[in-house]
Amino acid sequence: MAESPFKADIERAQKELSEKMTPGAIVYIPGSSVINKTGSWRVFKPEFNRDKCVRCYLCYIYCPEPAIYLDEEGYPVFDYDYCKGCGICANECPTKAIEMVREVK
């Protein structure tokens, strides 16, 4: 079978693209929400009950923003500057340690 006359062009294009593109499903930096505080328009906010928490980290895993981090003991801490009040954390919590309450400003 004869070699494609375009093989060199294809290989060069693949090399150029591979140098410019990141591997799939990897986000090296979050979107602009880290730069721009996004919690100012929230209607509900998560209220955390430490006594009910089993440290399963589902709230941390499912939070679509960088709004939850873990303290030294592994408990979630909510960064209200970035929390949009979506309620995903409360919905995913198996022990209902997170309750969404109306934001009072």
From Swiss-Prot:
Cofactor(s) needed, names only, are: [4Fe-4S] cluster
Q: Which GO terms describe its molecular function?
A: 4 iron, 4 sulfur cluster binding; metal ion binding; oxidoreductase activity, acting on the aldehyde or oxo group of donors, iron-sulfur protein as acceptor
Q: Where does [4Fe-4S] cluster 1 bind?
A: 53, 56, 59, 93
Instruction: Report which superkingdom the organism of origin falls in.
Output: Archaea
Matching InterPro entries = 4Fe4S_Fe-S-bd, 4Fe4S_Fe_S_CS, PorD_KorD, Pyruvate_synthase_PorD
Q: Which residues bind [4Fe-4S] cluster 2?
A: 63, 83, 86, 89
List, alphabetically, the SUPFAM superfamilies matched. Answer: 4Fe-4S ferredoxins
User: Which stretches make up the 4Fe-4S ferredoxin-type domain?
Assistant: 44-73, 74-103
Q: Membrane: is it a keyword of this entry? A: no
Q: Does the keyword section mention Transport?
A: yes
- Alphabetical keyword list: 4Fe-4S, Electron transport, Iron, Iron-sulfur, Metal-binding, Repeat, Transport
Instruction: Summarize subunit and interaction data from the UniProt record for this chain.
Output: Heterotetramer of one alpha, one beta, one delta and one gamma chain.
The protein in question is named Pyruvate synthase subunit PorD
UniProt organism field: Pyrococcus furiosus (strain ATCC 43587 / DSM 3638 / JCM 8422 / Vc1)
**What is this protein's gene name?**
porD
